[in-house]
Amino acid sequence: MRSIIADSKRLVVKVGSSLVTNDGKGLDHAAIGRWAAQIAALRAQGKEVVLVSSGAIAEGMQRLGWNKRPREIDELQAAAAVGQMGLAQVYESRFTEHHIRTAQILLTHADLADRERYLNARSTLLTLLRLGVVPIINENDTVVTDEIKFGDNDTLGALVANLIEGDALIILTDQTGLFTADPRKDPNATLVAEASAGAPELESMAGGAGSSLGRGGMLTKILAAKRAAHSGANTVIASGREADVLVRLAAGEAIGTQLIARTARMAARKQWMADHLQVRGHVVIDAGAVEKLRDGGKSLLPIGVIDVQGAFARGEVIACVGPDGREVARGLTNYSSAETKLIHRKPSGEIETVLGYMLEPELIHRDNLVLV
């Protein structure tokens, strides 16, 4: 089996905390130097690389003299602010050895949830790649709160892969890859060498939390691969402890787990809607509406809405939830939550009678709706 990375030109590489720190006690400068050297080798092959790197909080803890990861959000944010300085400095110095310029980009969910800011971030990243710069991305932990976090850098890596229409996402971790069961508990567990991204059975194989240094366990990596597949990006989950793992993957060696994007690439606008981690609200729709959305590719009409939850404005992304509580789709609503509460369960012909006006006959037009 040949590595999918060999034929991939635009890569997003995510490196976990344990691979760039000294067991959580500050940054491992030598390890970061090795990552810089490998990425330089990929660049020499004509590949474009965006790096998503953890390590800021661990470096901040070291600089502040803290031995234990704090629980309070303000202390975590302070550690991130201090640590980002060191993280940027080390990466810059190590890449300079290879005559490569780097750029630091700190993102929040709000940056990608707003369409204009999303497009601006995309334009900036593509310009940096065109200029031969290696963007180094992290979540802006200094300003985000729990409610608006990406949650982990695996998810952030997938979102960046979609943002720049990357060919592949490489998630480097301290684990060999995905196993059929927890190898620490099941001696019969075997490595999953290749599977389809988003295959339902993968989530049951994963599970479990990440280390205390980072936030992402294997389940977050599986879900990240599913998300990256929205834009057609394949994913490799591999051990960063393997010597020259990036160079070997680029040479075609199959290492770790390959998750192949087999579904059709979403249109850019629909990718953006699907990638919303938080939505303003949701509507509960009846079984008939679920069937029409899933099988018929229809728009969502007010008559198919059973209930309205949350507060949202016109033009915001909302979720559509079936009677069983599972999300079916999401899309841009033509009506606010207040308006939707007045017109739900009513035929479109009555919208003007109820509201005094009719913006559109649909609550969500099919062109602004994506199945999830």
From Swiss-Prot:
Keywords tagged on the record: Amino-acid biosynthesis, ATP-binding, Cytoplasm, Kinase, Nucleotide-binding, Proline biosynthesis, Transferase
Domain of life: Bacteria
InterPro entries attached to this UniProt entry: AceGlu_kinase-like_sf, Asp/Glu/Uridylate_kinase, G5K_ProB, Glu/AcGlu_kinase, Glu_5kinase, Glu_5kinase/COase_Synthase, Glutamate_5-kinase_CS, PUA
EC number: 2.7.2.11
GO MF entries: ATP binding; glutamate 5-kinase activity; RNA binding
Catalytic activity of the protein: L-glutamate + ATP = L-glutamyl 5-phosphate + ADP
Keyword Kinase attached: yes
Record-annotated disulphide pairs: none
Associated pathway: Amino-acid biosynthesis; L-proline biosynthesis; L-glutamate 5-semialdehyde from L-glutamate: step 1/2
Full protein name: Glutamate 5-kinase
Organism (species): Burkholderia vietnamiensis (strain G4 / LMG 22486) (Burkholderia cepacia (strain R1808))
Phylogenetic lineage: Bacteria, Pseudomonadati, Pseudomonadota, Betaproteobacteria, Burkholderiales
